[in-house]
């Protein structure tokens, strides 16, 4: 007997996957459910009739069938797909870490991740909870997962917006993390602004790794150049037109009036709480844990992403992106 073409066995397996997995969460009528079960049963009978052609695929489907009986939407199957993709790329698997245990998180939230390979009936984009922790990009099924579905180190990568990844209304929400001779990762955010924030944070970490001067210092350099231009203007002016310097005023030897005290018990707008654990690297940085209440004393370093906060009598600078408002006003 001639073997069944591989294209046909793949199509039958994909059809079974769609009937058993893709339609599992749909609100089907009683008649449609009966038809669905009948088709699944018939496909299994066909596979049993040609064991030499469906040997490997049938073994995989048997394992997946057990997962479908106890999981919604075949989440274990998608997790296996993610791990298989990582293994195929030769990526080094990091130890399992729960989403809530990540530290030094620069950016986190839900994204749609594009699968490297997907079947005819499979989903090309999968919803994932993603987090940039230090130099590692993690992705989970949800923010409550105890183990990541995959991760990769962003060293050597570059990030950019890419509207060619999709053809629908979300095409402008997409960005790509790629590198030469490495696997590319494609994601879709909920909006253009959210995608741009992801690109900005990832690019910031990449620049920090390569020692490129941050934007704030570049702006300072531009300000220095402006001062040089002002000097040139003053040199052109005639000397007689130069205004005379103001008379020197001797400082008054008395203390300035005290700043009115703020009642912290009612100053709810300046109370924040930690989103994640944060351990200070320097003596002037304030350490805190997720859920700790922090009172903000000053926002004068906001341009650099830092505030001055107080916790249990200790004062130090805190990263503002690690905080959220404690009270809803």
Swiss-Prot record:
Instruction: Write the record's keywords in alphabetical order, separated by commas.
Output: B-cell activation, Cytoplasm, Phosphoprotein, SH3 domain
> Which gene carries the instructions for this protein?
skap2
User: Residue ranges under compositional bias (Acidic residues)?
Assistant: 61-70
What this protein is called in its record is Src kinase-associated phosphoprotein 2
Query: What are the boundaries of the region Disordered?
Result: 58-95, 240-263
Which function does this protein serve? May be involved in B-cell and macrophage adhesion processes. May play a role in src signaling pathway.
Q: What is the lineage of its organism?
A: Eukaryota, Metazoa, Chordata, Craniata, Vertebrata
* Record family assignment: Belongs to the SKAP family.
Q: Which domain of life is it from?
A: Eukaryota
Domain PH intervals:
104-207
- List where in the cell it is found: Cytoplasm
Could you provide one GO biological process annotation from this protein's UniProt record? B cell activation
**Organism, as annotated:** Takifugu rubripes
């Amino acid at each position: 007997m001639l073997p069944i073409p591989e294209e046909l066995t793949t199509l039958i397996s994909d059809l079974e996957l769609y009937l058993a997995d893709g339609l599992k969460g749909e609100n089907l009528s009683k008649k449609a459910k009966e038809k669905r079960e009948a088709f699944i049963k018939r496909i299994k009978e066909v596979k049993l009739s040609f064991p030499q052609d469906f040997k490997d695929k049938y073994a995989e489907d048997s394992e997946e069938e057990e997962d479908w009986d106890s999981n919604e939407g075949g989440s274990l199957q998608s997790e296996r797909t993610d791990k298989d993709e990582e293994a195929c790329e030769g990526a080094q698997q990091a130890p399992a870490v729960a989403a809530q245990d990540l530290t030094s998180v620069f950016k986190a939230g839900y994204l749609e991740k594009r699968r490297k390979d997907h079947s005819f009936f499979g989903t090309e984009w999968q919803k994932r909870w993603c987090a940039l922790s230090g130099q590692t990009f993690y992705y989970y099924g949800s923010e409550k997962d105890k183990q990541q579905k995959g991760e990769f180190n962003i060293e050597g990568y570059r990030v950019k917006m890419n509207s060619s990844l999709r053809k629908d209304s979300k095409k402008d929400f997409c960005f790509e993390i790629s590198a030469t001779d490495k696997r590319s990762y494609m994601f879709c955010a909920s909006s253009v602004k959210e995608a741009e924030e992801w690109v900005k944070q990832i690019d910031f970490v990449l620049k920090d790794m390569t020692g490129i001067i941050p934007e704030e210092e570049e702006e300072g350099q531009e300000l220095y150049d402006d001062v040089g231009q002002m000097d040139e203007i003053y040199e052109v002016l005639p000397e007689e037109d130069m205004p005379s310097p103001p008379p020197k005023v001797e400082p008054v030897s008395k203390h300035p009036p005290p700043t009115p005290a703020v009642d912290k018990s009612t100053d709810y707008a300046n109370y924040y709480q930690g989103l994640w654990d944060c351990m200070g690297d320097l003596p002037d940085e304030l350490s805190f844990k997720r859920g700790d209440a922090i009172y903000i004393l000053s926002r004068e370093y906001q341009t650099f992403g830092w505030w001055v906060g107080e916790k249990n009598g200790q004062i130090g600078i805190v990263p503002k992106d690690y905080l959220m408002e404690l009270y809803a006003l």
